[in-house]
């Protein structure tokens, strides 16, 4: 009876070992797949980058910095009058430590006084910390008439230019541009968002510098989705470098 129980026990141990080995193999396989995502930058020669905010959670910047195909990162700093992205200061510090070219952006709220919004942005974004032009995220007009909205926006852009001694980069969607900003941004460098396989073509054929082509990109070091963008045509990273006097 003793030997039968011993044999049963040994059989049980062998079974558990096989189960554990199977589980371990599955875990390794899943982890391997989780670390590799065939993406647009794997199949083309354009210069690519990412846009992040606190929505990406904790970013493993060492992993992001190891990706030689990611040349730049824009990170949200502020929104409106008082909103400050909770991850901004940590993100910009860690991105610099890991060798990335960094720019900061402000989400523009047209109904809020421009001077107050600029103060919010400047309190977070020191020129010395910036590698790339400050960017203004223009996505909403909050029910304003188009003319009043544009007056509001360009007042803010002028204030931003005076504060940082260079014109900011403008981010907006292709449809938003065609409806409200058509023909008005030829003096600015522009990033256009359009999540399609084909490159955007704007109604006035604006020669925009950057294209944000997906909100569902993947990259090692960031859990979940991340916005990805790339330079258009022959445009280069030097065009959006922050000029330090």
Task: Write out the residue ranges for each language-model feature.
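Conserved, mostly hydrophobic/aromatic
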Residues: 64, 95, 136, 160, ...
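Catalytic domains of cell-wall/extracellular-matrix polysaccharide-remodeling enzymes
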Residues: 132-205
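Bacterial N-terminal signal peptides
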Residues: 20-31
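Structural recognition of the beta-strand scaffold that forms the well-ordered cores
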Residues: 48-51, 71-76, 101-106, 132-138, ...
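Boundary/entry segment of secreted carbohydrate-active catalytic domains
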Residues: 35-79
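Functionally critical loop-and-helix segments that line ligand-binding/catalytic clefts
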Residues: 37-49, 185-245
């Amino acid at each position: 009876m003793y030997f039968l129980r011993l044999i049963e026990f040994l059989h049980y141990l062998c079974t558990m070992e096989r189960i554990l080995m199977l589980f371990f193999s599955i875990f390794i396989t899943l982890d391997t797949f989780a670390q590799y995502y065939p993406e647009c930058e794997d199949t083309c020669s354009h210069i690519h980058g990412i846009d992040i905010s606190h929505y990406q959670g904790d970013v493993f910047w060492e992993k992001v910095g190891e990706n030689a195909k990611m040349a730049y990162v824009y990170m949200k700093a502020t929104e409106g009058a008082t909103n400050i992205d909770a991850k901004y200061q940590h993100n910009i510090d860690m991105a610099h430590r890991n060798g990335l070219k960094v720019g900061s952006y402000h989400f523009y709220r047209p109904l809020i006084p421009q001077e107050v919004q600029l103060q919010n942005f400047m309190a977070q974004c020191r020129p010395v910390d910036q590698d790339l032009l400050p960017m203004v995220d223009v996505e909403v007009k909050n029910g304003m008439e188009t003319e009043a909205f544009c007056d509001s926006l360009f007042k803010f852009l002028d204030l931003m230019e005076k504060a940082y001694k260079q014109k900011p980069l403008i981010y907006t969607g292709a449809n938003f541009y065609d409806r409200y900003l058509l023909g008005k941004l030829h003096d600015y460098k522009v990033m256009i968002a359009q999540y399609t396989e084909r490159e955007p073509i704007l109604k006035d054929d604006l020669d925009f510098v950057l294209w944000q082509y997906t909100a569902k990109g993947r990259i090692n070091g960031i859990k979940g989705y991340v916005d990805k963008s790339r330079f258009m045509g022959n445009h280069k990273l030097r065009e959006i470098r922050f000029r330090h006097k």
